[in-house]
């Protein structure tokens, strides 16, 4: 048992480069590859993420920039969110920030149009 504790202690003191070299040496000695399971898991994760994007029904309206007409943008943010003057001003000046989250595609497009008409730059994600 003392030998295992020493091995653990020795492995813990390795640098990242030394650990990578150790990994390569063990792969060669045992005839295995540590990279194969990781690549398969990454490919599976990417395939699983694709259907989620296709089914997206909720969108976030992000104010990326207030533009030159900040006062009109603040008024529009207040109308959309129901925030007070100070909170709306802080949101506009702190761009990029979410104005509304988890809204339908139609509502997100409507909010984007209103904010852009007020002079803001907006992203829908």
Swiss-Prot record:
Q: Which InterPro entries match?
A: Ribosomal_bL12, Ribosomal_bL12_C, Ribosomal_bL12_C/ClpS-like, Ribosomal_bL12_oligo, Ribosomal_bL12_oligo_N_sf
Record keywords:
Ribonucleoprotein, Ribosomal protein
What superkingdom does the record give? Bacteria
Cross-referenced SUPFAM superfamilies, in alphabetical order?
ClpS-like, Ribosomal protein L7/12, oligomerisation (N-terminal) domain
Q: Name one GO cellular component term.
A: cytosolic large ribosomal subunit
Pfam families per the UniProt record, alphabetical: Ribosomal_L12 (PF00542), Ribosomal_L12_N (PF16320)
Q: Does the keyword Nucleus apply?
A: no
Keyword hit for Ribosomal protein: yes
Describe the function of this protein: Forms part of the ribosomal stalk which helps the ribosome interact with GTP-bound translation factors. Is thus essential for accurate translation.
Subunit structure, interactors included: Homodimer. Part of the ribosomal stalk of the 50S ribosomal subunit. Forms a multimeric L10(L12)X complex, where L10 forms an elongated spine to which 2 to 4 L12 dimers bind in a sequential fashion. Binds GTP-bound translation factors.
Q: Which family does it belong to?
A: Belongs to the bacterial ribosomal protein bL12 family.
Task: State what protein this is by name.
Answer: Large ribosomal subunit protein bL12
């Amino acid at each position: 048992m003392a030998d295992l504790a020493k091995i653990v202690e020795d492995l813990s003191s390795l640098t990242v480069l030394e650990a990578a070299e150790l990994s390569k040496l063990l792969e060669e000695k045992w005839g295995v590859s540590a990279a194969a399971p990781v690549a398969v898991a990454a490919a599976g994760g990417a395939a699983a993420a694709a259907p989620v994007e296709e089914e997206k029904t909720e969108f976030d309206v992000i104010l990326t920039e207030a533009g030159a007409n900040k006062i009109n943008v603040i008024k529009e943010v207040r109308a959309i969110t129901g925030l007070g003057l100070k909170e709306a001003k802080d949101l506009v000046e702190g761009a990029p920030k979410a104005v509304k989250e988890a809204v339908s595609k139609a509502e997100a497009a409507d909010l984007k149009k209103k904010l852009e008409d007020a002079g803001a730059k907006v992203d829908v994600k």
